[in-house]
Each structure stands twice: as structure tokens, then as C-alpha cells.
Amino acid sequence: MDPNCSCATRDSCACASSCKCKECKCTSCKKSCCSCCPAGCTKCAQGCICKGALDKCSCCA
């Protein structure tokens, strides 16, 4: 699977644990890709890169 999760907006897709949210646009991926983002983060699918499994990510820090 593409580690960047490039999928159309609002389409459903599954993201691997290695997904970095670089190209993720679908709402179903936001949680699985950016589990380190706080709830309600609107930037999770916009270049977010997690710094750790339970740490804050670069876009929400």
C-alpha cells in the first residue's frame, strides 16, 4: 500500500501504520494516519508527520 495514502477526498481507504499523511485527503484516514494528533485537528491530512506513536505531530504541535 502507498505509505503516503494518496486517495481522493472523502473516499474511504485503509492506511498502514507507516503512513505519514503526506498526501492523505480522505476523512477515513485522518485518525489512523495521525493518531498522535489531538481530536479535532484540522491539519491532520496536510503534511502531518508524527514524532512518536503517542507524541504530538508536526502539524498540531
Curated annotation (Swiss-Prot):
Q: Which UniProt keywords apply?
A: Acetylation, Cadmium, Copper, Metal-binding, Metal-thiolate cluster, Zinc
Which region is the signal sequence?
Answer: none
Binding positions for a divalent metal cation 5? C34, C36, C37, C50
Give positions of region: Beta: 1-29
List cystine links.
Answer: none
What's an example GO cellular component term for this entry? cytoplasm
Q: Which residues bind a divalent metal cation 2?
A: C7, C13, C15, C26
Q: Summarize where a divalent metal cation 7 binds, as residue positions.
A: C50, C57, C59, C60
| Residues reported in the UniProt entry to bind a divalent metal cation 3 | C15, C19, C24, C29
**What terms describe the molecular function in GO for this protein?**
zinc ion binding
Where a divalent metal cation 4 is bound, by residue?
C33, C34, C44, C48
Q: Does the keyword Metal-binding apply?
A: yes
Residue positions annotated to bind a divalent metal cation 1 are: C5, C7, C21, C24
InterPro entries (UniProt xref): Metalthion_dom_sf (IPR017854), Metalthion_dom_sf_vert (IPR023587), Metalthion_vert (IPR000006), Metalthion_vert_metal_BS (IPR018064)
Q: How does it assemble?
A: Monomer.
Member of which family? Belongs to the metallothionein superfamily. Type 1 family.
Recorded protein name is Metallothionein-2E
The species this protein was found in: Oryctolagus cuniculus (Rabbit)
Q: What is the lineage of its organism?
A: Eukaryota, Metazoa, Chordata, Craniata, Vertebrata
